[in-house]
Curated annotation (Swiss-Prot):
Subunit structure of this chain's protein: Homodimer.
Protein name per Swiss-Prot or TrEMBL: Thymidine phosphorylase
GO biological process, one term: pyrimidine nucleobase metabolic process
Gene of this entry: deoA
Keywords of the record: Glycosyltransferase, Transferase
Family indicated by similarity: Belongs to the thymidine/pyrimidine-nucleoside phosphorylase family.
Length: 440
């Protein structure tokens, strides 16, 4: 039998905690036998003293085991259970293509996603722009969709990693969110509860990233890869660029529109294509659905070219109570904003810099994102046709198309977009999309 305060004292004095001590504390978080003050104290000691790799693995597994861990054995699936997690960014709509692409190649993707907060968009919000789309199917329905379609994207239920929810809420109000061991356990506790065989982690770098520097992003990627593999899940990570909006659009309905166009081949933003492909390749290789990256890439290109990936997406939407003809008629179903008009730069030149975070916040200004978790959002608003870095701009070339619900919010967002996009004299070199791959 342990005492929470003795566990806090031990960590405060710089000693590593045992697996039993960590489990006792996390179970207490779940059962409400550990107080909010004690959670705050332990979080702060971890923030200052860090955690060894065995401690991080133990914390992650304790978070995972605080609730239900999905088990797919009874379904006798003929492929691996694989998923992707992104640290979030702006215009990061990869999940909507990646899930169907990997499923079309024989993987099973039970993706449990989140909502948007602040400048980062949320996959669930994007999907809820589709009329009728149900992000909370019951357990039987969820398993049924995975068995028959191969991919489902749903919201986190209270039964998955419940200790994390309480632990995170305390971190949020005690300035202990940005601790690498705590971020690692929070992300992986939820992801590993999906019962995965393999995971790929997309860690963003740059002005729209969650981590402030390349070094911090790299540190997080390395921590996640080591801890997830230590917990028995084949995991790699990619460090990808978020110095500009990833897709050509940012918002909810506008990003779903772009995802459908990507899957059908109507329009594929080259940067979005590169990142999505790179992540899918990792998933196929880690899940042993391909012998090499080259073979994986070919398989993925094939399911895009022959329409299988688009078909899987259509079946997922229908299975989750969306329209059965959504892919063919997405424009009919997706909400459109009252006002759509372009914003222009005040001078000619090249787009040399982009404050991606500020562009994400302009979507919040329009009503398409949240400042706090309880905010309602307008699915129709956002930005589209965003000029990429290096684009030559004159006073007739728009920086972006702004979709707003009033002239006032259009004007506010236009000012933010102009400020966020720097126009310079010379064309800058574009940065790579994938900086490096992190594996064990």
């Amino acid at each position: 039998m342990f005492l929470a305060q003795e566990i806090i004292r031990k960590k405060r004095d710089g000693h590593p905690l045992t697996e039993e001590e960590i489990r006792f504390f996390i179970n207490g978080v779940r059962d409400n036998t550990v107080s909010e003050g004690q959670i705050a104290a332990l979080a702060m000691t971890i923030y200052f003293h860090d955690m060894t790799m065995p401690e991080r693995v133990a914390l992650t597994l304790a978070m995972r085991d605080s609730g239900t861990v999905l088990n797919w054995k009874s379904l006798n699936l003929n492929g691996p259970i694989v998923d992707k997690h992104s640290t979030g960014g702006v215009g990061d709509v990869t999940s909507l293509m990646l899930g169907p692409m990997v499923a079309a190649c024989g993987g099973y993707v039970p993706m449990i996603s989140g909502r948007g907060l602040g400048h980062t968009g949320g996959t669930l919000d994007k999907l809820e722009a589709i009329p009728g789309f149900d992000i909370f199917p019951d357990d039987e329905k969820f398993r049924d969709i995975i068995r028959h379609v191969g991919v489902a994207i749903i919201g986190q239920t209270n039964s998955l990693a419940p200790a994390d929810k309480r632990f995170y809420a305390t971190r949020d109000i005690t300035a202990t969110v940005d601790s690498i061991p705590l971020i690692t356990a929070s992300i992986l506790g939820k992801k590993l509860a999906e019962g995965l065989d393999a995971l790929v982690m997309d860690v963003k770098v740059g002005s729209g990233a969650f981590m402030p520097t390349y070094q911090k992003s790299e540190e997080l990627a390395e921590s996640i890869v080591q801890v997830a593999n230590g917990a028995g899940c084949q995991t790699t990570a990619l460090l990808t660029d978020m110095n500009e909006v990833l897709a050509s659009s940012a918002g909810n309905a506008v990003e779903v529109r772009e995802a459908v166009q990507f899957l059908t081949g109507e329009y594929r933003n080259p940067r979005l294509f590169e990142v999505t492909m790179a992540l899918c390749v990792e998933m196929l290789v880690s899940g042993r659905l391909a012998d090499s990256r080259q073979q994986a890439r070919q398989k993925l290109q094939d399911v895009l070219d022959n329409g299988k990936a688009a078909e899987v997406f259509a079946r997922m939407v229908a299975a989750q109570n969306g329209p059965t003809d959504f892919v063919e008629n997405y424009n009919k179903y997706l909400p459109t904003a009252v006002l759509s008009k372009p914003v222009f730069a005040e001078k000619a030149g090249f787009v040399t810099e982009m404050d991606t975070r500020a562009l994400g916040m302009s979507v919040v200004t329009l009503g398409g994102g949240r400042r706090k978790a309880t905010d309602a959002i307008d699915y129709s608003v956002g930005l589209s046709e965003i000029a990429a870095l290096g684009t030559e701009i004159n006073t007739d070339t728009p920086l972006a198309m702004i979709h707003a619900n009033s002239e006032k919010s259009w004007q506010e967002a236009a000012a933010e977009v102009r400020k966020a996009m720097v126009i310079g004299e010379t064309k800058r070199e574009t940065s790579p999309m994938v900086y490096r791959q992190v594996s064990e």
